Amino acid sequence: MGKMGGSRHLKSLAAPGYYPIAKRERVWVVKPSPGPHAIDEGIPLLLIVRDMLKLATTAREARRIISMKKILVDGKPRYDYKFQVGLMDVISIPEIGVNYRMVPDPHRFLRLIEIPQSESKMKLVKVIGKRTIRGGRIQLTSHDGRNFLLDGRDVKPGDSLLIELPSQSVIDHLRFDTGSSVLVTRGRMAGRIGRVEGIGTIIEMRDLENPELSYRGVKENLIVVGKERPVLKLR
């Protein structure tokens, strides 16, 4: 979880480089609220509404749209214009019938892709923590700050869960294993989807779209998105 103290404002020159703003035109930029995504892993909702989706031309217009609870993130209305939207989050605007997923990009770090209505209530989350709690139950923590209590599932950190939104009921468990499809989340290959060919300190992958292309990465920068093919639209 990202927490920031000090000023309630953020100078545009100090903002993450991937923010969709013209830094020379704006002195200040909205400072994200503490939430499930760190400051360098998400984009405030106001910037998404105004600068990415072009639903408003000014910050005031964007705040008004958000305050009217017209924007859903992961199936829930969000009225805090500073709310951070990050990797794999789903944005829905029921009034105009459009849905988007936040995916990695090699140049902009994060970008939105439009997704079908049938996928608007599904999300992939990466398991980043696992511990046993009272009663012997297993608690899992995901990359977006969610907690899951599961019995009888051999889920490991690095695996992914396909969940239903907003209930976060688990639909499927995707293991990080040889043959799994993984999405690269950082680096020059960010946004590419590869099939795992070798697992060690470095993960060996072969691109799904271009089998002649192979690349390597670390597990921390990968998220399992399917067994043989991605279970959701990611490109």
From Swiss-Prot:
GO molecular function ontology, one term from the record: rRNA binding
Domain S4 RNA-binding: 43-114
Pfam families, alphabetized: Ribosomal_S4e (PF00900), RS4NT (PF08071), S4 (PF01479)
InterPro entries the record matches: Ribosomal_eS4, Ribosomal_eS4_central_region, Ribosomal_eS4_central_sf, Ribosomal_eS4_N, S4_RNA-bd, S4_RNA-bd_sf
A GO biological process held by the record: translation
SMART domains documented for this protein: S4
PROSITE patterns from the UniProt entry: S4
Gene3D superfamilies per UniProt: 2.40.50.740, RNA-binding S4 domain
Chain coiled-coil ranges: none
Gene Ontology CC terms, in alphabetical order: cytosolic small ribosomal subunit
Keywords: Ribonucleoprotein, Ribosomal protein, RNA-binding, rRNA-binding
Range of residues in the leader sequence: none
Family: Belongs to the eukaryotic ribosomal protein eS4 family.
PANTHER family in the cross-refs: 30S/40S RIBOSOMAL PROTEIN S4 (PTHR11581), SMALL RIBOSOMAL SUBUNIT PROTEIN ES4 (PTHR11581:SF0)
Protein known as: Small ribosomal subunit protein eS4
Species this protein is from: Korarchaeum cryptofilum (strain OPF8)
